[in-house]
């Protein structure tokens, strides 16, 4: 069997939703035995669509000769990996975009913290180097070497 792409599963899901809508309409307009055969037919179609979806979404180990790749716009189903947290959000009837937004905000806060620490250490490095140059002139060469290696301000560029 050929590898299943995301668009195939998407089409299968749309078909299942369409069958559910048709069943809802048939139940709403149910008139008794004369519409029963139509409702049974629609339920059988839904069963077939669900069976197709189930077949397409079963995990399949990649075969050795299976070198097919999905495109960037339509990846193979087995290549898609979702974080378990997103699955939990959907299971809890929450919008997965909320998880994405919260994750991005958390990463931004972490980046800001790290940037602040980096700037604080750079400032401390420069102050320490300046004080060491003035207190121990014999270590000036070593201080300059360390500053050059760590990207610090040199003595001749400081004001």
Swiss-Prot record:
Keyword Lyase: no
A single cellular component GO annotation: mediator complex
Signal peptide range: none
Location of the region described as Disordered in the Swiss-Prot/TrEMBL record: 54-77
Family the UniProt entry places it in: Belongs to the Mediator complex subunit 10 family.
Reported function: Component of the Mediator complex, a coactivator involved in the regulated transcription of nearly all RNA polymerase II-dependent genes. Mediator functions as a bridge to convey information from gene-specific regulatory proteins to the basal RNA polymerase II transcription machinery. Mediator is recruited to promoters by direct interactions with regulatory proteins and serves as a scaffold for the assembly of a functional preinitiation complex with RNA polymerase II and the general transcription factors.
Protein name: Mediator of RNA polymerase II transcription subunit 10
Species of the source: Aspergillus fumigatus (strain ATCC MYA-4609 / CBS 101355 / FGSC A1100 / Af293)
Organism taxonomic ancestry: Eukaryota, Fungi, Dikarya, Ascomycota, Pezizomycotina
């Amino acid at each position: 069997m050929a590898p299943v792409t995301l668009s195939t599963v998407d089409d299968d899901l749309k078909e299942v939703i369409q069958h559910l809508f048709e069943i809802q309409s048939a139940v709403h307009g149910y008139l008794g035995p004369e519409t029963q055969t139509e409702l049974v037919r629609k339920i059988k179609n839904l069963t077939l669509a669900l069976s197709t979806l189930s077949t397409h979404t079963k995990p399949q180990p990649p075969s050795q000769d299976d070198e097919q790749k999905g495109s960037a716009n339509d990846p193979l189903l087995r290549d898609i990996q979702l974080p378990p947290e997103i699955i939990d959000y959907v299971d809890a009837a929450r919008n997965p975009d909320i998880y994405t937004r919260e994750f991005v905000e958390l990463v931004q806060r972490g980046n800001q913290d790290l940037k602040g620490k980096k700037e604080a250490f750079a400032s401390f490095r420069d102050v320490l180097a300046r004080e060491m140059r003035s207190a121990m002139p014999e270590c000036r060469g070593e201080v300059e070497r360390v500053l050059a290696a760590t990207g610090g301000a040199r003595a001749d560029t400081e004001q």
